[in-house]
Structures are given as C-alpha cells and as structure tokens.
C-alpha cells in the first residue's frame, strides 16, 4: 500500500505536467505569429489587431468607415507606424469582432461580423497551402491580368469545377491564396487546392491498386521529372521578375518606374552582349573551319546567321513585351492614385457643402472646390501625356487609345460642370464662389496644359479630326414656356445614342461620383446631342436673367461636303426633332463655356465672346507700338546727353602729385627741424 501510494503521488504531477504541456501550445498557437489587420464598420470606430492578438478600438472619433483602398493603406500605416506597410489584401473569411464603439465613444457593446484587411508588411509573400491526399494543387498566373481578391476567388472556384478527381468525382476549392501584387489590393494570379466532395471508395482503390502498380511507378517517375522541371522554372521566374511588380510604393511611383525601366534596359543590354560574344566565338570557329572544309563552313555560316537573327529578334520582342508590361502597371497605378485623389476631393467638397448649411464657411468650400478642379485637371494632363507618348512609340496603340482619350476629356469637363452645378442649392454661396472657381479653372488649365490650338504638337492630328471635335458640343433644348426663336437650317450630324451608351459602358472605370450626382438631381434633365463642329456661323440666343445666363437654343450651319452626307445628316436631324417633341423639355442652366469649342481649345473655353477680345487687341496694337517707340527714343536721347557731359568733363590738364602722403609728411617735419633718429645713431657710431 505504501509503495502504491508513492507511485500514485509520483504519477499525478507527471500527468498534470503532460496535460499542461499538451494544452499550452494550443492556447498559445493563436498568438504564435502576429498578423497586422484592420477592420471597419460604418457608424462605429475602427479596430486594429494588437501584437497580443486582440482587437483594439481606435481612440480617434473621426477615423471611421473607410472604403477607399488608399485610405485603408494610409490607416494601416497609421495603426502600425513601426512597420513598412506596402499593400493591403482582404482577409480570406469574415471575423466576428466584439466591443464595437459608436463614433461618440461609448458604449462599446456591439458585435459585428466583418471581413478585415490584412496589412502587408514589407515584401508580399503568398500563403503556403497544404495539399491533402486525393487533392490537387494548381494555379492561374498571368502578368497581363490584374484583378482584385474577389475575382481570383471566383476564378479558383471555376477552375476547380472543371477538374475531376481520380474517382471521377467533382472537386471544390479547399483553400486558395493570391499571388504577386500588381497594384493596391490587386493581384496577378491565384494558387488553390481542389479536393473532391466525397472521399473516394477505399474498396475500389484496393481492387485496382495491384493492377496499376506498374503504371503508378511510371507515373510517379514522370511526375518527379515534371516536378523537378517545374521547380526549376519556378526558381527562375522569381529571379527574373523585377521588384517593381512585387511592391507598390505609392509615394515614389514615378522614381520606381524609372528605375524599373533602367533595370530592364540593363538586363537587355547584358543579354545582347552575351549573344554578341557567342557570335564572336562562332565567327572564330567559322574561320577555322573555312580553311579545312569550305562547303561545310558555308553551311555552318548560314545556320549561324539564321540562329543569330532568331535570337536577336526574340530578345527585341521580349524587351518590347517587358516594357509594355511595366508601362501598363505604371499606368494602372497612376490612374488608381488619380481616381483616389478625385474621390477624396469630391468627398471633401460635399462635406464642406454640408457643413456650410449649419455654419457658413465660403473659404472652405472654395478651397475644396479648387482641390477637386486640380485633381480632375491632373487626370486630364496625364491622359494627354500618355496619348502623346503612344503617338511617338506605337501609332496603332495610339489609334486604339484615341476613343478613350476623347471619352475622358469629355467627361472631365462634364464632371467639373456638374460639381459647379451643385452650388445652385446655395445662391449666396454660388454668387461668391462660382466666378472665382471658374477663373481658377481657366487659369490652372492655361498653366498646366499645352497650348494645343496654337502649338504644332503631336496632338494636332486628333484636334483636326472630326470625331475629336465632337467631344463637348451640346445642343440643349429650352423649356416650352420660353418664346421659341426663329429656326435656321440645322444640318448637324448627330451620333446615335447607342454609341454614347456603349462608350460609357466601355469606360466605367473612369466614371466619378459626380456623374451620379448630376444624374440624380431632380430638377436637372437634359438631352445631349454630340454635334460635328465645322461651323460657318453659330448663333446663340441668350435669355438675360438676374442670376446666370441661360442657353435657350443653338442652331449650327455646317459645310456641305457631299450630297449623300447632307441627306443622311438632314434625316438624322429630322428624326431627332421628332424625338424632342415626345420628350418633356425642362430648363437646364449650363455654363456658357459648354457651347464653345472643345475643352482642349483652352483659350476659347471660358470666353463667351472671343471676337470682342480679338477686335480689342487689334485696336490697341498700334498704340502699344507707338508708346514703345516713344520710350525707346527718350532712352536714346538721355544716353546721348549723358555721354556728351562725361566727355566734356574729361577735357583739360590734371596736376599729378609725384609724392606720397608719407613723403610729404616727412618733408614737412624736416622743415621744422626733425631729424631721423636712425641717421643720428649711425653717425654717432661712426
């Protein structure tokens, strides 16, 4: 009994220690690797993951409900200042988080299930996936594609549905992970594991196992060889991929793009040097063989030339392809940043208008409106610069890109006009802000945009193209309550509405929230017709009112190039008139600049009567020249008089004193009896 009690006393602590050792890893495994994550829920304060593995509420009241990707990236950097946050990615599943606080701060008692965002620290590394038995691993990766997390999740599901297991079972996605990032929360591919819905029948496997042993051995050998080759390829691909594709540094995007181009050119130069070195070795071999076997040497030379040309052409094609990939990624990142800036500027402008209702603040509204105009104009300038670059680099791609340029330039002006139209709900604010904003818009465009209407630039072909001239010409019908002016000939050529709709659908990526605001405004309904601009004369009837000029009706008279063209244009204009009768016509207050030529004619954009300005400048030109000549004559006469006076003053003789002031002083002292002590000293010595 004593021995038994002693054994029990020794075994109990051992069992307790064993249970604790087995249980402690399970409990601490949750916090074994810290993952920086942030979570958002509108109406509540943001939360972020601490290093202990618990969710913490943000202390700031205004840090709430972020939806833009750039805002989320900035918040990640703010929540984790010690980390190098370079990108974000949605978490793979929703997480239930408790203790959500209202924006006011308390109480903190709500629980929500949200999908947090993983803040990528440093270089992006894809998650390692486990492949269970009877499951298959696969991946989809293309540098030409750049899509978000949800797209690659759906793509993984589609790929697994097309696969079959060994037992001819349908397969589903077990796990997946996105691959290399190409932009903010955008990725180039996905890797996934597909598993069968049901486990395979073990009895069937045992029956066929003995018959298929030999085949399995061969398949295993083949799979080993294939895996070795694929491993070699996988090892080569990351080394050849430029770091620019892996990490997106939004603050230094332009510098990173230039460095990536330099690295790409350096790699291409090294490859060409290597080929030239091989060519030199082959040339030496050819010369040696030519002395021994001339026919064989000529055959070898022809093969060598063909191989060399093929190698050089493949290197050039690879270099062009890599350059296009880098430019495409750069364009996408820049456009994403521009869209994010426009979105932020629109949000600030609307918030300033909402604040102005309770607390008038004209300065804040004006500053936010200027910031929005700057964001739109930067997008416009970027579009023009990209088109100019494509004209120099690839004319075919530039021709394909031209409709997008037309669409973007048109909608940039429409969005800015729609933003200005939001001021109509505040008459006092509109009277103060609108003239300043319109003047600032014109001055800023004059400053940042090239003078395309005068300058002989690369955009000249697109300016003189008829299709490009259609981008901002609007024919807006007046309400039925106004007096109808006398109609003139209207041979305008009207584009079908289906074309404009398809154009909008093709470029939804560049749409902004301002378009939706304009469309949703109840007292604004307009019929827009895009008209060819080759006018002989344009007559505009303007109804004068107290607040703003209102465009009543415009009639355009175009040149007659062809009889067929005239007939088609007249029929199209008649059909449009019939449609206008069936549509309820409402008044639309628009800027006078809309009825002027397109936005790229920047001098005429914001001037209602450019003829007056031109006539005024021609009248004052002689006066300016006469005043300049008069001032020049006065300057010449004054210079001549001054020069004559100087010459007159220089005439005569000037007495020159050969003695220095010291010598004159010593001579004066000697006259008064002064003797040099040095001389007297030497006289006494002698």
From Swiss-Prot:
The UniProt record lists the keyword Transmembrane helix: yes
PTM characteristics: Extracellular region is proteolytically cleaved.
Biological processes per GO annotation: axonogenesis; body morphogenesis; central nervous system development; ecdysis, collagen and cuticulin-based cuticle; nematode larval development
All ranges on the Extracellular side of the membrane: 22-621
Signal peptide: 1-21
Annotated Gene Ontology cellular component terms: cytoplasmic vesicle; early endosome; membrane; neuron projection; neuronal cell body
Comment on protein domains: The NPXY motif mediates the interaction with clathrin.
Note: Lacks conserved metal-binding sites and has only weak affinity for copper in vitro.
Family: Belongs to the APP family.
Descriptive protein name: Amyloid-beta-like protein
Originating species: Caenorhabditis elegans
């Amino acid at each position: 009994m004593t021995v038994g009690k002693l054994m029990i006393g020794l075994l109990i602590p051992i069992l307790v220690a064993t249970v604790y050792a087995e249980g402690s890893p399970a409990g601490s495994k949750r916090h074994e690797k810290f993952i920086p994550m942030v979570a958002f829920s509108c109406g509540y304060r943001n939360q972020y993951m601490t290093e202990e593995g618990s969710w913490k509420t943000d202390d700031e009241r205004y840090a709430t409900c972020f939806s833009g990707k750039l805002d989320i990236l900035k918040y990640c950097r703010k929540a984790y200042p010690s980390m190098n946050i370079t990108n974000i990615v949605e978490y793979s599943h929703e997480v239930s988080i408790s203790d959500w606080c209202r924006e006011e701060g308390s109480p903190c008692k709500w629980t929500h299930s949200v999908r947090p965002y993983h803040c990528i620290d440093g270089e992006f590394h894809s998650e390692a996936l486990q492949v269970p038995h009877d499951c298959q691993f696969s991946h989809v990766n293309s540098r030409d594609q750049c899509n978000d997390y949800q797209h690659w999740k759906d793509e993984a599901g589609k790929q697994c549905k097309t696969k079959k297991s060994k037992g001819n079972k349908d397969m589903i996605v077990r796990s997946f992970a996105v691959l290399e990032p190409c932009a903010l929360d955008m990725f180039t591919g996905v890797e996934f594991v597909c598993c069968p819905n049901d486990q395979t029948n073990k009895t069937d496997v045992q029956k066929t196992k003995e018959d298929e042993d030999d085949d399995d051995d061969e398949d295993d050998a083949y799979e080993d060889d294939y895996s070795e080759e694929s491993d070699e390829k996988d090892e080569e691909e990351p080394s050849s991929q430029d770091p620019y594709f892996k990490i997106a540094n939004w603050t230094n995007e332009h510098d990173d793009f230039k460095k990536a181009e330099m690295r790409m050119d350096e790699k291409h130069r090294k490859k060409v040097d290597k080929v030239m070195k091989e060519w030199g070795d082959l040339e030496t071999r050819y010369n040696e063989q030519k002395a021994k076997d001339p026919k064989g040497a000529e055959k070898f030379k022809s093969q060598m030339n063909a191989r060399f040309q093929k190698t050089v052409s493949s290197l050039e094609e690879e270099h062009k392809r890599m350059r296009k990939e880098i430019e495409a990624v750069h364009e996408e990142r820049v456009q994403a940043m521009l869209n994010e800036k426009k979105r932020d500027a629109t949000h600030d402008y609307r918030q300033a208008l909402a604040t102005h209702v309770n607390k008038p603040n004209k300065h804040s509204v004006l500053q936010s409106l200027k910031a929005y105009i700057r964001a739109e104009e930067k997008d416009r300038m970027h579009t023009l610069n990209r088109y100019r670059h494509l004209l120099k680099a690839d004319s075919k791609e530039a021709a394909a890109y031209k409709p997008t340029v037309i669409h973007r330039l048109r909608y940039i002006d429409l969005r800015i006009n729609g933003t200005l139209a939001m001021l109509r709900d505040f008459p006092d604010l509109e009277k103060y802000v609108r003239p300043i904003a319109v003047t600032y818009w014109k001055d800023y465009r004059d400053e940042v945009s090239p003078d395309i209407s005068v300058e002989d630039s690369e955009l000249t072909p697109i300016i003189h193209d008829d299709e490009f001239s259609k981008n901002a010409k609007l024919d807006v019908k007046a309400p039925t309550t106004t007096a109808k002016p006398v109609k003139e000939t209207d041979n305008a050529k009207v584009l079908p509405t289906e074309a404009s709709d398809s154009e909008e659908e093709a470029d939804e990526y560049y749409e902004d929230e301002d378009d939706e605001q304009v469309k949703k405004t109840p007292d604004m309904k307009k019929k827009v017709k895009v008209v060819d601009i080759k006018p002989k004369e344009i007559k505009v009837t303007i109804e004068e009112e107290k607040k703003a000029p209102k465009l009543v009706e415009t009639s355009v008279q175009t040149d007659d190039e062809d009889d067929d063209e005239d007939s088609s244009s007249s029929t199209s204009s008649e059909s449009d008139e019939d449609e206008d009768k069936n549509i309820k016509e409402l008044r639309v207050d628009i800027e006078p600049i809309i009825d002027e030529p397109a936005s790229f004619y920047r001098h005429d954009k914001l001037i209602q009567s450019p003829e007056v300005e031109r006539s005024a400048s021609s009248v004052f030109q002689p006066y300016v020249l006469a005043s300049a000549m008069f001032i020049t004559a006065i300057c010449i006469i004054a210079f001549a008089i001054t020069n004559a006076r100087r010459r007159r003053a220089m005439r005569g003789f000037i007495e020159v004193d050969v003695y220095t002031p010291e010598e004159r002083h010593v001579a004066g002292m000697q006259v008064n009896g002064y003797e040099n002590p040095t001389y007297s000293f030497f006289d006494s010595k002698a």
